[in-house]
Structure formats: C-alpha cells, structure tokens
Amino acid sequence: MALKSPAFRKKFPLLVTGSLLAMQPLATQFVVAAEQYDCSVSASGAWNCAPKSTAAAVELPPRPVHSTASVSSNGTVTSESSSSGEQVAGPQLVTEAKGKGLKSRSADYSHLDWVPREKLTAAQLAETGPYCSGAYVEPIRPGMDDKTPMKDAPMFVGAKASRYEQEAQVATLAGDVVLRQGSMQVQAQEAALHQAENRGELNGDVRLRDNGALIVGDKAELQLDTGEARVDNAEYVLHKSNIRGNALYAKRAENAIIRLKDGTYTTCEPNSNAWTLKGNNITLNPATGFGTATNVTLRVKDIPVLYTPYIYFPIDDRRQSGFLPPTIAAGGDNGFTLVTPYYFNLAPNYDATLYPRYMADRGLLMEGEFRYLTKGSEGQFGGAYLNDENDDRKLQSDYDKTRWMINWHHKGGLDTRWLTQVDYTDISDPYYFQDLETDQIGVKRTDFLNQQGSLTYRGDSYSAVFNAQAYKLATVANVTPYNRLPQLTLNGTLPYNPEGLKFDYQTEAVRFDRDLRTGTFVDENGNFESRLDNNISGLDRANGDRLNLAPSVSLPMNWSYGFLTPKVKYVYTQYDLSLDGTGKSQLAASGGTFDSSVNRSVPIFSVDSGLYFDRNTNWFGKDYRQTLEPRLFYLYVPEKDQTDIPAFDTSESTFSYSSLFRDNRFTGSDRIGDENKLSLGITNRWIEDNGFERQRFAIGQAIYFSDRKVQLPGVSFADRDDAKANVSPYALEYEYRFNRDWRFNSDFNWDPDSKSTRSGSAMFHYQPEAEPNKIVNFGYRYRNDQIRYDESTGRWIVGGGDYGRPGDPNYVKDYYKIQQHDFSVIWPIVPQWSLISRWQYDYNRERTIEAFGGFEYDNCCWKMRLVNRYWIDYDEFSQAAPQNEKGDRGIFLQIVLKGLGGVTGAKVDSFLDKGIQGYREREDQAF
C-alpha cells in the first residue's frame, strides 16, 4: 500500500505495509503489531495510535515469538550465538579485493547481479560477448521503469519486523527491508528512519538500485525526500554497459549521478582484475553516459602501469564531449607517437573531433574534423597542419616542410529532385600520406585525390548533372591526370513508347584540361631526372572540349521463356582541341598533322537475346530448381579512323564474361571500337526452394567476322594477335556456395589460338554466420592481358607489361604481370586464443609481398594481438616506382581495453582489415 497524501509525504514519506507486519514476529514490549492498534495521522503530522477494542483483540491470533533475530530497543538486529560459539567474521573491505568483486558477499558474485553463462536466456546470450562467462542481469522489480520525479513519488516500504518510537520519531525496520520510491529501490537487513530529519540509516547487505545501476555496501545513509545516498564499502554495477567497480564509499546525488571516493572502474568480470582504472574521485553520470576521474592509474593485475591526472570515459554508447582513448605507437619514420583525441558533442546533429598527434621525429600534427547531419544532407570538414622537423626529404622536389591537408565530403538534397555532392581533398605535397597517418573518417589514401563537386537534377525519366572534377597527385611516380572542368550530362528515356519502342539518349559536354609539369625532378640524393610528364608526346599533350551525343532506339520484347532486344544507336562526337608547341613539333616530326576541330560519327547495331529453361531436380538428396539460360548477342560497329582524337578518359576494358555482351570494348567516349561479332554465353544455376543460389556456372565466347582495327594511341592492331583472331578467349565464371558459410568463386579466360591462359582467379572464403571469428581465405590470381599507360615511356602497353624499356636503368621485366597467391586465416585454436596469419606471394618476381603471423587473445574485458609482419613498403624517393619498393619488417602489438578503447597498436587493425577478407565483419559482430 502507498500513502498518496502530499502533505503527509512531505512531513514523513513512509508507510509501513501492515500486511507484512502482521505476518512477522515482533521481539520486545516496544514492538507493536499493526493489527492490534488503530493508527492515524495527528494534526501535527505524527502517529496517533490507540489499542483496538477488547472484543477485537480477542479475535487476534497469538503473537509469534522470535527464535533467531529480533529488533532491539536501540534498533539493532540481534542473533543467537551459534552452538559452537564461533565468531562471525567481520565484513571484508573492498580495498582488499584488489580490483575483483567481494567473494565474502557471495561466492558466485550474485550480489552484483552476476548470472553465469549457462543460466542466461537466448536473448541474454545474444547480448553477451563470446568469451564472457556470464553477464550482469538486472532483476525485474516493481517500479524499475517509473519515471515519476522523486519529489512527487510515494514511498513503499516492506520489512519482516518494525518498531516506532513516537517521541524520537524514529521507525526501525528489520529483516528484508525494502524501500521503494519512484525508480529507486533500497534493500537492507535493517533500517532506522528519522522522521524529523527525513533521512534513513541502513545496515547490513545494503543494495541501492536505480536506472540500471546497482550499488552494494555494508551500510548507507539515505535522504528520504531527495533520494541522495551514501553507501560505505561500496561495489557498483552498470548493467547495460557491463561496468563494475568499488569505492571506499559511493554517493548517489539527487540527479542520480554517482560519485566514488578512492574508486575503481572496469569492464572485467567480477573474478578478474585484468585491468582497472583507479582514481581518487570518480564520477559516473548515467544521464550523459560519461564518467570522469582524477589522479588515475591504469592497473593491470592491480599493478599500476600508467598515470593520468584526468580522464573522461564513456559508460555507454552515447556521445559526449571529452577525451577519447589515446593511441600510443613507437618506431617507423615518426618515432614515438601519442594521439590524444578530444571529442566535441556540439549538438545532436553535428560534432567535431580534434586529433593532436605528437611524433618525436616530426613534431606536433594538429588534425581535426567537423561532421554534420541535417534533414537533407550529411558531410564532414577536416584539416591538418604540421611544421615538419624531419628533413629526410629536404632535397626532393615538391616537398614542403609545412605539411597540411584539407578535405570536405558532402552529400545532400535540396529537395527530392536536386542532389548535391562534394568530395574534395587537397594536400601540401605528394608525400603527405606516405609520411603521415590520418585519423579522419572518410579520407581515402589514393594516388589521385578527388576534388569534385556536382549538382544533379532527377526528372521523371531523365537526369541532368553539372560536375566539376579535378585531381591532386599524391605521388611523383605518375603523370598529371586530366581534369573535367566542367562536365554537363543529360541522360534519359523519352516518356512515350509507340509500338513498344524505347527511345534513350545520352549527352555530354565536357572540358578536359591539365597543366603538364616541365623541367627536372630531384630525388633524395639530389640527383636530377626528367619529369614523367615530359614523356607525354604528340597528341597526348592536347587539352580540349568534347561534345558527345548518343541517341538510341530499341524494341525490348520479354516473355517468361526469354527476351529479344534489337537496338540501333548513333554516336556523334565533336572535339575542339588545343595543343602546345611541344606537342605540335613532336606530331610534325612523326609525320602527323594537328586539327583543332575533329568530329566522329559511328552507328552501332546490336541484337541481344536469351532463353530461360528450368526444371526441378534433386542433387544428393536436396531439391533444387535448375536453370539453363543461353544468351546470344550480335554487335556490328563499322570501323572509323580515330587516330586524330586524344584519349582523355578512355582505356580498354580487360576481357571477361560480361565484356562479351558490351557494345564498346573501350571505356569512356574517345574510342568506339569497331566490331562485327557474335557472342554466345550459357549460364546454369542451382537454386534452393528458399531462393538461395547454391551454384552458378557460365561460359561464353565471341566469334569475330572482322579484325578490330580501332586501338588506343600508339597501339597498332597489326601487332596484336588478339585483334586479328577469329574467336575470343573462352570466358568462364563459376561460383559455388557449400552453404551460407563457405563460398568459392573463380573466373578463367583461356585463349584457344595461343593455347594459354589470358587471366584467371580462384578464391575460397569461409566465415560462418554463427561464428564470424573463424575466417579462412585462399586465392590465386593470374593476369597477363592488361592494357595500361606506361608513365616511364609515355606509351600504351598491351600484355603483362614491363616497367620501362630494355636497357633503361630502371627496367623491370613483367613488372605489371600478376601471378600471386594469397592465403589468410584467423582461427581459434583454444578458447580465447586465435591464430592470425597471411601470406601473399608474387610468383612472377619470386618475392613475398606481405606475410604476417601472430596470435590474438580475447576475453570479456580486453584483447591483445601480437603480430610479426613482413611487407613491401612503398616510400617515394624516386619517380621510378620499382625503386621505391623496399622490404620491411616489424613486430606489432595491439592492446584494446574494452570500455576504454585501444591503448596501442592502431596500425594492426589497419593492415588486418586490408589484408584479411571478412576481418571487418568479424570485428563488427564481436563484443
């Protein structure tokens, strides 16, 4: 029962539950049973009790007699001595536990709501880490979700026995005392409630619960009207966050903030002191989800290993301003490194993070980012600055000791049709990402940094895009790329379809421009060499405008058993070119001419068709739907001389099964490949009743009726056997899923003319859905048909590709040919211990590209990885890419304290993520 009168509760918010009192024995003459007295509130607010009538009293049952415990006149609980006369040991102090839970309170730590793993429900197991032997489970109790403010909430009280002294205005309760007000509940063996002072004193097995927090102690003082409390010799638990600790005493403020004196903080299990934070003053704020501590030592097995005067840490997954876990590293080109991030929770929809990075060999790098999220957009600004004290590159061209980076990433919509996008990164020098790490989210480390902004309008049947895109070189081993400044595209489909005809159109107007670098490059030793841009010659040096129009008409015909789509496309391209004097003179020397205005018109005719057959079948006792899907594609494109057109954004696609059914073997619009071919492909699938595709096999080949004479600049079809062949290589693709955990993918392209493999790959991947911590990858790749631009010669190369030309000082045969195997594994060998390994080997150059091996230890509250790694490091001191490759090795240690974050070894996470397929999924699903 509860007292609802605000006037009375303000005086003394307490009503002893009569039904409980009537059932329990009372010890002394001062103890009264509620059933034998009529009690009411007097005018002064005190108790007014009178004995019931004799008649009523006769009907009462006899009073029971205490046999073991009673409430004394001074409010203490007395117990009979044991027959052996042994003294009961006094309570153990939390300081004696050395970071563990107090076993003297319960051997199984049930006093901390600890539930062993075998007793958890399926839902609780799903929220429990794989290596945790249990979890903190808050028991269901009345009022636990009550949101009533403490000052407005009535108090409920229960106990086995009670006594009230009217003169002192003190109520004494004994035996399983429970006080509940709002969401807070306090339990103890005995309690003395002082009406005049509105406070309570509790002794023996004190437990205070509120908002997912539990505080356990030997005794406590409680302010009855506000909920403020002090618990001595305290242990605490935050259930949802798996956080626990202890303190000399814990104070609960009126706003539910918990303050600990000489307290500890850890996410380890009650029987573990693997790591703890110990501080003079620790504050835990459930309202914000963060805690603070002063004069803090990080202790491992109760041994101090690190000191900080102040720390700010999360106690759940909410955002809050403050320091994030630091990162410590040593070695490399930067020496000892310390990163101490500070997070600014500016608003629910935007925040910022500052990353001060101290590097012993370079100085202080200040880096920061600002993130925003609005109803129609999201994005991130970032920047970094360093006055570099390292002078290893002081002789190199393009180096600047004032290092900086700026970036902006944005995606947004002005409304449902207008879209905006920005992807912009700029750096001080091309060596920035080779020398310096970045902590910003979304910054991509590539050789060509994107500097792009676009505005898109999406109509009902068309889209229009205004795009401006430039590139910043983050390397000296490549030539300057073309910028698109600006680019306009309009693509769509006409909204009417007479007789089933479909009218499509693609239009583009774009300006290609670049400033080629001239002069010489100076390497680390002060040696001079010609810039790579000087290798670009003739028409390849041109800038220009390009207008491309590509309307088409098709007649799609679809049936349940197949499809047929004849299509006619017409491509018209107009160029307005400009060429510098060097390019003109080189063109004239080779017997060529330059025309600033060039156009090209090419019709394209194709017929795409396919059939669909299926049947129900059974394979090894399993029912499947087996399909057979033949496809026939005919393409005719007449030859058009395009040698007077530069290749602004064009290259040749590598051969694959999907390339059999394209209408242009080139990417971009500067080359339209002449074709007269018939492609045949067949796909076979095995599909389970639930839609799961167990197996897929596809094979195809093209028959050519004419040579392919249109080539990239400087490439002659007469020198290419594949351009004169009557048939294409056989293209095969195969995928088999043993189940949802095992997957095998492969592709294979075999040339019947040369009777050799053009390219191929096979990849085996294993990662169980139920056990994502198990990963096995094995793959093999071979490719000798690449078509690429060679920066060292300024020419397009067909085949595997050498670096340079025979006789050049930096010549490397088959540098770009790929023939590699890649094996990686993460596998539990015993509980909590996993093996980590990768080996990537280049058969072509007979060298290991990367190899590492080590182990991981993972338990409920911390994780450690120790990895020995060898890799080919790439650090540019020369324009010749092979000269910048050098073998390196190191031993890497990563330690993660769960609940605090990584203490050291962030680079381990980086190369594991890059080198082992499935690693990121493993970490995302781990606890």
Swiss-Prot record:
Pfam family, one: LptD_N
Keywords: Cell outer membrane, Membrane, Signal
Biased composition (Low complexity): 70-86
InterPro entries, A to Z: LipoPS_assembly_LptD, LptD, LptD_C, OstA-like_N
Renumbered residue ranges of the record's region Disordered: 60-100
First-listed, main subcellular location of the protein, grouped into a coarse class: membrane
Subcellular location: Cell outer membrane
Complexes and interactors: Component of the lipopolysaccharide transport and assembly complex. Interacts with LptE and LptA.
Protein name: LPS-assembly protein LptD
